[in-house]
Amino acid sequence: MDELNKLMGDLTGYEAPTDYANLYISNAQDPSKVSNYVRDLDMRTALATVNYDYEGVHYTREYFNSYPDNIMAVRLSADQAGKISFDTNLENLINGTAYTNTVDGDTITMRDALSTNGLNVEAQLKVINEGGSLSTGTNGGNPAITVSGADAVTLIFACGTDYKMELPNFRGEDPHKAV
């Protein structure tokens, strides 16, 4: 058994997969005034879309996830200029031992470490606006970015850890550079 323990190494690197963050996109639209709401998933392109009308404006949300790039892209657009306005923020779900959540210009960066095994996790949300303006503040106590009067906006969400499938401790490089 001692030989097996030597081969296995320190087992503190093990942990079950877990969700790290919620991405919130909040607007001031009254849901009771939304019409023609349609959700769609194109299996050929892996593009999920939401289309709806609100107070005479047609809105489109497009979602795409890329496993090789470890990103999710969200595009929000409208058929009239200057109609995209919302707040966005990240919420930490793991409540680990090294939590930080900051906003700098167009990017929110959230870091933490799992309390059970010290796995480092980082998520970044970049907001790319076409027209309108960006400002920073807080939403529910979390750093937030507010988009006002944009023609369209693309959100790029990336998340990574220092997990590495390699004995003995299953740890690799800090995730910051990769994210």
What residues fall within each predicted segment?
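Aromatic-residue-lined binding/catalytic grooves and analogous aromatic/hydrophobic interfacial grooves
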Residues: 1-179
